């Protein structure tokens, strides 16, 4: 959460580092009533490298920047307005050989209203935009410019009701319009080996209602429980291919293509009930047991390119041929503190059961493919693991050690003869160590160590 601007006096804060600099400005617009905060930072490894005469950076550019803004207006004791915005971009340019740029921009307007001592409300309007660009400049045969984008328009209302000292109820509603522009390629001149092309656009409306309660049953036992009702509908303008075998779409077996007008409903809506439950039981003043169950539904899918060496990832909505990912997760953990909370320890185990998991056919072509559903396979998956943590938060030496053992598998017809196989996200072992030593008021030493199992890999067994 970004801090609020100072409503009493103007001020600034900044820092100049070896690789980046930052600057923050804040102050009142109307004293004690309306404030602002502006912050920005930029790396300059490329500038310093060129100034130092590093040949490998002579024609190359690499940096990122981000800008943040926030403004708070106190209308009265019961009403406040919050405005915030963010913009950031990563840039990598390899001379005249290639370039990559990707960035995010968001803007939020929020109204906070207090109805009384027991209930308050937040109504928010949120805009977000993610864009990715990749290309080869110039007018040679390999020149091209690729771009993709996702825009979201989100409206939501959230309520919190302090019903009594034992119960805190939260409920609300939200609606998001997703606009996907999976890819567009343009060229410079007639020499390029590529042709100008734009993949089909996708739009969808995602809505949800939720209700939850945090209940304290006794000094030792508390729990949270609730439910979320989600609704997802793909809408036009767009086209849908009809295949001879809808369960196994083949781009060589398209019977017809149906066109839909702007905001027309495309296919059936996906409606899901998502229950959540968690509990905490305090064994004594230093230890407790926690457990939870969650059902989650993901309607947006990340399609990662399997052939291009660049991160040409594509986001797509659930649709006629791509069903929502459904996950059921259970977990239980033991937590204990030692020596007056100087040391915190925990051990947790979890299990996930996943349905409608996506993977790709052998040699899948995802780049500039307008029938991408023909490259996908559907199945199920599981994930299980153990997480252990030891944390020291007091004294001159602080830090933590974390270890995770996990196993993530998929079972998809058409891959590995239908037998389970490790997911690309599988990491059997993950060990992290973070430490900090405060020598005095001026000197602090820090050290980090990370070990992780590599990606699952299949090797050829013969030439």
PLM features per residue range, with description:
Residues 2-4, 16-20, 29-31, 40-46, ...:
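Transmembrane beta-strands of outer-membrane beta-barrel pores
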Residues 152-156, 198, 206-208, 317-323, ...:
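Outer membrane beta-barrel strand-and-loop segments of large Gram-negative receptors
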Residues 350-353, 370-461:
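Gram-negative outer-membrane beta-barrel transporters
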Residues 131-132, 179-191, 233, 238-256, ...:
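Surface-exposed extracellular loop regions of Gram-negative outer-membrane beta-barrel proteins
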Residues 172-286, 415:
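Signature of Gram-negative outer-membrane beta-barrel scaffolds
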Residues 17-44, 55-91, 99-123, 127, ...:
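Transmembrane beta-barrel wall of Gram-negative outer-membrane proteins
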Residues 9-11, 53-57, 92-98, 106-110, ...:
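Extracellular loop and loop/strand-boundary signature of outer-membrane beta-barrel proteins
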Residues 33-36, 46, 78-81, 115-121, ...:
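Repeated loop/turn-to-beta-strand initiation elements of outer-membrane beta-barrel proteins
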């Amino acid at each position: 959460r970004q801090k609020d601007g100072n409503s009493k006096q103007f001020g600034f804060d900044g820092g100049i580092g070896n690789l980046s600099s930052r600057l923050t400005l804040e102050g009142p617009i109307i004293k004690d009533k309306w404030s602002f905060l502006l912050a920005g930072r930029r790396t300059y490894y490329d500038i310093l490298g060129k100034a130092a005469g590093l040949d490998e950076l002579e024609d190359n550019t690499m940096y990122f920047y981000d800008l943040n803004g926030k403004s708070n207006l106190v209308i009265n004791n019961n009403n406040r307005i919050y405005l915030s915005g963010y913009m950031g971009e990563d840039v990598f340019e390899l001379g005249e050989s290639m370039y990559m740029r990707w960035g995010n921009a968001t803007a939020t307007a929020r109204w906070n209203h207090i109805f009384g001592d027991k209930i308050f409300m937040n109504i928010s309007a949120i805009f977000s935009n993610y864009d990715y660009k990749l290309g080869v400049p110039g007018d040679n045969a390999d020149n091209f410019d690729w771009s993709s984008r996702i825009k979201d328009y989100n409206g939501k209302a959230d309520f919190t009701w302090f019903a009594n000292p034992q119960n805190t109820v939260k409920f609300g509603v939200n609606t998001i319009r997703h606009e996907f522009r999976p890819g567009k390629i343009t060229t410079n001149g007639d020499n390029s080996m590529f042709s100008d092309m734009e993949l089909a656009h996708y739009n969808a409306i995602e809505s949800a209602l939720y209700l939850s309660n945090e209940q304290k049953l006794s000094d030792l036992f508390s729990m949270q429980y609730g439910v979320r009702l989600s609704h997802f509908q793909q809408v036009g303008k767009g086209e849908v291919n009809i295949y001879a075998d809808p369960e196994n779409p083949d781009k060589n077996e398209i019977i017809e293509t149906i066109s839909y007008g702007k905001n027309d409903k495309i296919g059936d809506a996906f409606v899901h009930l998502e229950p959540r439950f968690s509990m905490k039981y305090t064994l004594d003043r230093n230890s407790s047991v926690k457990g939870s169950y969650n059902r989650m539904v993901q309607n947006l899918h990340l399609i990662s390119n399997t052939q291009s060496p660049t991160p040409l990832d594509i986001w797509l909505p659930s649709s006629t041929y791509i069903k929502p990912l459904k996950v059921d997760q259970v977990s239980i953990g033991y937590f204990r503190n030692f020596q007056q909370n100087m040391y915190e320890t925990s051990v947790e185990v979890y299990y996930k059961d996943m349905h409608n998991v996506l993977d790709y056919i052998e040699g899948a072509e995802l780049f500039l493919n307008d029938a991408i559903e023909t490259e996908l396979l559907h199945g199920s998956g599981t994930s299980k693991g153990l997480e252990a943590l030891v944390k020291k938060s007091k004294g001159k030496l602080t830090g933590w050690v974390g270890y995770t053992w996990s196993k993530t598998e998929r079972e998809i017809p058409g891959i590995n003869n239908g037998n389970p196989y490790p997911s690309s996200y599988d990491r059997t072992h993950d060990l992290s160590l973070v430490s900090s030593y405060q020598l005095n008021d001026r000197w602090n030493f820090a050290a980090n160590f990370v070990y992780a199992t590599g990606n699952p890999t299949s090797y050829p067994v013969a030439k």
